[in-house]
């Protein structure tokens, strides 16, 4: 076979419906060697040159052939790549573009800071709720996601993670310094006020911000409530907590939600109640209550059965119980739900459907993340 017959088909892993691109390997680069002597790193450069819009940098891709991730220092011969073979391109996580902080309305910010500063110094329950939120990794991550520019401001991140610094920077007198230098921190502090205000009563009611209904906070840019931050928050003001049947379905920002129509559906409250009941009932291994019998009693929390039984609920126990609850609710088979992704993984040479399903389940059906998980050996 002449060198001019050497070509490869290239397909982007995250665009399964896109046609393959034909990559003709240049003869002049081969010299005395056969095409099989090409290194994988050189092949990446050729692909980046061919697909400039989709692959701007060869360092940001991995190549997959017959279910194997190709190493840069190996050759085509090493992996048995022949003319006409299809190589799949897996794009690595792209670096996040720099986000500019949202502009700060200084007048509104001053009003919010005064409310927060007063509440921090006059209400121990409010102060504890604020610091509990900031010490919780998940809630802090949500604040970072909801506040453009915050992730690239190390000083602002340090302030949010230190109680003393937060108390100092939440002073209205600091605004003149913060607005030009750390606008993202100002927006984050205001977001903290809105978030905690939805779950902990503000001291006094003379401020328009304090008397504002909690539902209106969700309508503000970047605003969301941490209603489900921690069960321990019930210790502050139990009378102000809403019952599970009337609570807002989601307290996470939209950017943290599920992506893609093929991802898993959200867990319903009845399924969560069933899981909690299963996890806290000793007989749960032999009996699976139906979701229709859980979480609908008036004025009764689905946590009550777990509290009364005194059985400690571990993460593993809860995960197993949640699986039982989802199965009892008639959740479609994962193999049917993610059939297109499974077929795509098979096309790449990954024939272990059980491994693929676990990876897809862990990544919410994201094919690219599932591939990275499989090749990293991290599929559960």
UniProtKB/Swiss-Prot annotation:
Binds ubiquitin. Interacts with MAVS; this interaction enhances TRIM21-dependent 'Lys-27'-linked polyubiquitination of MAVS. The keyword Phosphoprotein applies. One of its GO terms (molecular function) is protein-macromolecule adaptor activity. This is Ubiquitin-like protein 7. Residues 333-377 form the UBA domain. Residues 200-313 are annotated as: Disordered. InterPro entries: UBA (IPR015940), UBA-like_sf (IPR009060), Ubiquilin (IPR015496), Ubiquitin-like_dom (IPR000626), Ubiquitin-like_domsf (IPR029071), UBL7_UBA (IPR047878), UBL7_Ubl (IPR047877). The gene is Ubl7. GO terms for biological process: antiviral innate immune response. Interferon-stimulated protein that positively regulates RNA virus-triggered innate immune signaling. Mechanistically, promotes 'Lys-27'-linked polyubiquitination of MAVS through TRIM21 leading to enhanced the IFN signaling pathway. Deubiquitinated by OTUD4 which stabilizes UBL7 expression. Residues 206-221, 239-253, 270-293 have a biased composition (Low complexity).
């Amino acid at each position: 076979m002449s060198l001019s017959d050497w070509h490869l088909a290239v397909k982007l892993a995250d665009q399964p419906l896109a046609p393959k691109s034909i990559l003709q390997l240049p003869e002049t680069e081969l010299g005395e060697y056969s095409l099989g002597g090409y290194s994988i790193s050189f092949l990446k450069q050729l692909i980046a040159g061919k697909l400039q819009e989709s692959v701007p940098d060869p360092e940001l891709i991995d190549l997959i052939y017959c279910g194997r991730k190709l190493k840069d220092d190996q050759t085509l011969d090493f992996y048995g790549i022949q003319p006409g073979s299809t190589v799949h391109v897996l794009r690595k996580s792209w670096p996040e573009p720099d986000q500019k902080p949202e502009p700060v309305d200084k007048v509104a910010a001053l009003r919010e800071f005064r409310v927060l500063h007063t509440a921090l110094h006059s209400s121990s329950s409010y102060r504890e709720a604020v610091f509990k939120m900031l010490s919780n990794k998940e809630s802090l991550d949500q604040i970072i996601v909801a506040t453009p520019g915050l992730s690239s401001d190390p000083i602002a991140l340090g302030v949010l993670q230190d109680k003393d610094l937060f108390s100092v920077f939440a002073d209205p007198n600091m605004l003149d310094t913060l607005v030009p230098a750390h606008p993202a921190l100002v927006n984050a502090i205001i977001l903290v006020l809105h978030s905690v205000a939805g779950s902990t009563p503000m001291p006094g009611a003379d401020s328009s911000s304090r008397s504002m209904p909690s539902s209106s906070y969700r309508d503000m840019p970047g605003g969301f409530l941490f209603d489900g931050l921690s069960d321990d928050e019930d210790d502050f003001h139990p009378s102000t907590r809403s019952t599970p049947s009337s609570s807002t379905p989601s307290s996470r920002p939209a950017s943290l939600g599920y992506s893609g129509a093929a991802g898993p559906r959200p867990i319903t409250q009845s399924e969560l109640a069933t899981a909690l009941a299963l996890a806290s009932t000793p007989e749960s291994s032999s009996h699976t209550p139906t979701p229709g019998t859980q979480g609908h009693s008036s004025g009764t929390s689905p946590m009550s059965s777990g509290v009364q039984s005194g059985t400690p609920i571990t993460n593993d126990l809860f995960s197993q119980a949640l699986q039982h609850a989802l199965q009892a609710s008639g959740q479609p088979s994962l193999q049917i739900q993610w059939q297109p992704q499974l077929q795509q993984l098979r096309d790449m040479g990954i024939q272990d459907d059980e491994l693929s399903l676990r990876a897809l389940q862990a990544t919410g059906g994201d094919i690219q993340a599932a591939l990275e998980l499989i090749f990293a050996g991290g599929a559960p």
